[in-house]
């Protein structure tokens, strides 16, 4: 099972029937909706398609709304596009004009006040560079540094300049309120430059009474400079390498990627590495070697999730792109030596939750546990465990569907549905039973359970327990390929008075005496010391269609009256408690 999550952008390439289901089966965890394109009606239709597909494949898929953000763009050109020659003069104006080879409008009215003579302006994702020669009223006069084509609505970037754009445009606000109505799980906030930008978005979400998690997209030098204050108020980060590589030198992006991932790991906040990860697969069925290395290195850096953009939204091979990413993740995770404490430093001032989660990782590591089970309301406990990157599985048991979906962005966490309970014993039992039921753990696995008591409150994680799930108590020869769980009833303890026997009890006998046949008929199963497929115990099991374990020599010494056990006729095993005896 891959531990790195995959975010897939949906679009025309995923509209064909069955594509989304196949992408989910291939490893998709989160559906991204790019609100730079498409109407609300189109986005709502695709969101419903994702929900329907997730129901078909029985998988939880989170929805992520990616805002257009405060962008500066060119206006419309008379011919739709023009070709600029190196050395020519080209003017940008805040007036509304039709674009020509010499002039274009821009949508940011304050641009003339933000820039200075000598600044560089990049057009069309950095394909054309301009140098500012003069600022004359509403006009910015520039010289074209290199030839290239530009066209309608192409992006305008001014590296190193903090533009006076509002963090949330009118369109963004409308999109956010639409997302609240549609029940999205995450908002990817584009072009975040400072902490107050995140606060402005959160204010809109809270006005709709929605607790939607905000993933800050770092796409310019100002965002990089203020990364720490942004992370104070954001719920996670997206390393948006495409726009970031336009705003700052491309050679600096790999180092910044590692820096931002490390900061998120240390804080226990999810981080997505995005843009051009398998770009060639938009048109080709296989990635380049460089792309495969890029994906693998992001995983080794510690990213929680890796993202596909045009590869799935508009590409010819969306399913193959997801499957390729899954294979790269699985191979990288197996080869990588994940030290449990290399990804996150211990806090100088630890909270109770962080201390208990770190301790649970250490206990699991030392005991060789198969899984850490976290009983969680909001998912915070699972995130706190995941920040230490344990070698074993992390299984979050929660009563809330929205928490299950949020965990789809968290490294290594598998979320399953539970129900609200207060008693700690019931909490542990539910976690183990749920994990066994989904096949996340197997009978006999040692697991570490962490939770908060009393339950129901966020941030109260204060309990660690070590359990063996479905511990094997006895082995013998099985009759009938079925399993059953019930309470132990030891016939020898009742001195020929069996009135206390309840339907479904597990009858324990030395030999099947004739007087026991009446209650054997009502038993869930039989555990017998006697052996042999022609023994009376075997005949009783076959006659009444119930599983029998024969030759359980130490049954009377090992089992306790009333103990809950599971007997597995196929494997000839008796497990303690409820076991997923498949």
Predicted regions and their residues:
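N-terminal intrinsically disordered, low-complexity, charge/repeat-rich segments that act as generic
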Residues: 1-65, 69, 291, 306, ...
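Conserved alpha/beta-domain cores
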Residues: 3, 8-13, 42, 161, ...
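Short, ordered loop/turn segments at secondary-structure junctions
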Residues: 10-13, 28, 35-38, 67-70, ...
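Glycine-enriched alpha-helix->loop->beta-strand junction motifs that scaffold or abut catalytic
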Residues: 25-30, 181-185, 205-210, 232-237, ...
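Acidic, glycine-rich flexible loop/linker segments
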Residues: 70-169, 173, 434, 440-495, ...
């Amino acid at each position: 099972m891959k531990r790195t999550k995959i975010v897939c952008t949906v679009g025309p390439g995923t509209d064909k029937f069955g594509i989304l289901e196949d992408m989910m089966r291939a490893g998709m965890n989160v559906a991204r909706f790019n609100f730079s394109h498409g109407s609300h009606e189109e986005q709502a239709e695709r969101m419903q398609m994702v929900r329907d597909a997730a129901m078909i494949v029985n998988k939880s898929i989170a929805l992520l709304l990616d805002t257009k953000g405060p962008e500066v763009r060119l206006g419309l050109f008379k011919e739709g596009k023009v070709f600029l020659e190196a050395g020519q003069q080209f003017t940008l104006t805040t007036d509304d004009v039709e674009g020509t080879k010499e002039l274009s409008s821009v949508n940011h009215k304050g641009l003339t006040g933000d820039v200075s003579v000598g600044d560089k302006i990049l057009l069309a994702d950095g394909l054309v560079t301009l140098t500012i020669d003069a600022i004359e009223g509403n006009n910015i006069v520039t010289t074209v540094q290199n030839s290239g084509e530009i066209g309608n609505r192409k992006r305008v970037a001014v590296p190193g300049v903090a533009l006076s754009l509002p963090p949330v445009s009118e369109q963004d606000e409308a999109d956010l309120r639409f997302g609240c109505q549609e029940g999205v799980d995450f908002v990817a906030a584009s072009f975040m430059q400072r902490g107050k930008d995140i606060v402005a978005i959160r204010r809109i979400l809270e006005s709709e009474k929605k607790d939607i998690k905000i993933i800050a997209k770092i796409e310019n030098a100002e965002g990089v400079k203020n990364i720490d204050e942004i992370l104070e108020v954001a719920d996670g980060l997206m390393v948006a390498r495409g726009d970031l590589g336009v705003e700052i030198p491309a050679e600096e992006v790999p180092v910044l990627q590692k820096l931002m991932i490390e900061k998120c790991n240390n804080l226990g906040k999810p981080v997505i590495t995005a843009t051009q990860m398998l770009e060639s697969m938009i048109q080709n069925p296989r990635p380049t070697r460089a792309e495969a290395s890029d994906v693998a290195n992001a995983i080794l850096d510690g990213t929680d999730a890796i993202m596909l953009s045009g590869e799935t939204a508009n590409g010819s091979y969306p399913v193959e792109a997801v499957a390729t990413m899954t294979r790269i993740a699985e191979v990288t995770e197996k080869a990588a030596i994940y030290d449990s404490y290399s990804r996150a430093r211990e806090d100088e001032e630890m909270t109770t939750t962080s201390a208990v989660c770190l301790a649970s990782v250490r206990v699991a590591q030392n005991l060789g546990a198969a899984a850490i089970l976290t009983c969680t309301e909001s998912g915070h406990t699972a995130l706190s465990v995941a920040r230490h990157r344990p070698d074993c599985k992390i299984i979050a048991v929660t009563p809330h569907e929205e928490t299950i979906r949020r965990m789809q962005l968290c490294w290594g966490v598998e979320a399953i549905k539970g129900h609200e309970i207060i008693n700690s014993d019931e909490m542990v039992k539910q976690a183990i039973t749920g994990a066994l039921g989904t096949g996340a753990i197997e009978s006999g696995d040692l697991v570490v359970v962490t939770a908060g008591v009393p339950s129901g409150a966020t941030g109260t994680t204060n309990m660690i327990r070590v359990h063996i799930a479905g511990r094997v108590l006895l082995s013998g020869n099985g009759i009938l390929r079925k399993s059953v769980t019930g309470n132990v009833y030891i016939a020898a303890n009742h001195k020929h008075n069996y009135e206390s026997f309840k339907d479904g009890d597990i009858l324990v006998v030395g030999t099947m005496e004739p007087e026991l046949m009446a209650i054997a008929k009502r038993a869930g199963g039989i555990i017998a010391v006697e052996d042999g497929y022609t023994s009376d115990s075997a005949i009783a099991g076959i006659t009444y269609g119930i599983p029998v374990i024969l030759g359980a020599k130490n049954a009377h010494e090992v089992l306790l009256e009333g103990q809950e056990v599971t007997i597995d006729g196929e494997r000839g095993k008796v497990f303690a408690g409820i076991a997923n005896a498949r």
